From Swiss-Prot:
The keyword tRNA processing does not apply. S-adenosyl-L-methionine binds at G76, L81, V127, E128, R142. One of its GO terms (molecular function) is rRNA (guanine-N7-)-methyltransferase activity. The gene is rsmG. InterPro entries: rRNA_ssu_MeTfrase_G, SAM-dependent_MTases_sf. Keywords: Cytoplasm, Methyltransferase, rRNA processing, S-adenosyl-L-methionine, Transferase. Specifically methylates the N7 position of guanine in position 527 of 16S rRNA. It is an enzyme of class 2 (transferase). Belongs to the methyltransferase superfamily. RNA methyltransferase RsmG family. This is Ribosomal RNA small subunit methyltransferase G. It is found in: Cytoplasm. It comes from Aliivibrio fischeri (strain ATCC 700601 / ES114). It catalyses: guanosine(527) in 16S rRNA + S-adenosyl-L-methionine = N(7)-methylguanosine(527) in 16S rRNA + S-adenosyl-L-homocysteine.
Length: 210
């Protein structure tokens, strides 16, 4: 068993997540591809594969139990975060991964081809120009500097009835929540426990006021 495989098992044992052998293989395969492509494409500032396991894989998949619905979009996905790890963990759900940079979308296409991931649709577009045929149960992102930016840029993406925004944040700020536009409010703040990751992590659920 490789060091990364042992590290992964140790980290997962500290969570309530159930990960199959295939999912583990795909998640670690994604780390290997990210590490390989990163040298030429500069996809992430995290250079070390063992750090990627914590900061990219675990940090993404701890969100998995919080997902409800079938259709998700990851806006500003970068190299596929958190979308690829979440798609691996939820093969029955569909994930659209949106980014404006071609090199990132090319990388994601390579990942889904090599790892045989069938529930991801990569799209190169600016968020404000992307008009989906069908809206989403949830809009995910860890890319936006503020929740206000996220809901303003992505307001046209969630389902009107019950669609939500899921913002992956470090420290949760009441001040930032108070700055949200009038039509939107915080529905829930969940503390995420990421084994061996320093600093706070939160998942903030936002929705339009009914």
């Amino acid at each position: 068993m490789t060091d990364l495989s042992q590290q992964f098992d140790r980290l997962i044992a500290q969570t309530d997540l159930n990960v199959s052998e295939l999912q583990k293989e795909q998640l670690l395969g994604y780390v290997a591809l990210l590490h390989k492509w990163n040298k030429a494409y500069n996809l992430t500032s995290v250079r070390n594969p063992s750090e990627m396991v914590i900061k990219h894989i675990l940090d993404s998949i701890v969100v998995s139990p919080k997902l409800s619905g079938e259709r998700f979009i990851d806006v500003g996905t970068g190299p596929g975060l958190p979308g690829i790890p979440l798609a691996i963990m939820n093969p029955e759900k569909s994930f659209t991964l949106l980014d404006s940079l071609g090199k990132r979308i090319r990388f994601i296409k390579q990942v889904i081809h090599e790892l045989k991931i069938t529930n991801v649709t990569p799209i190169q577009s600016r968020v404000e120009e992307f008009q989906p045929e069908e809206k989403f149960d949830a809009v995910l992102s860890r890319a936006f500097a503020s929740m206000t930016d996220m809901v303003n840029w992505c307001h046209h993406l969630p389902k009107e009835e019950d669609g939500v925004f899921l913002a992956l944040k470090g420290i949760y700020s009441e001040e930032e929540a108070n700055d949200l536009p009038e039509w939107c409010s915080v529905k829930n703040v969940a503390t995420l426990i990421v084994p061996e990751l320093e600093g706070e992590r939160h998942l903030v659920t936002l929705a339009g006021k009914k």
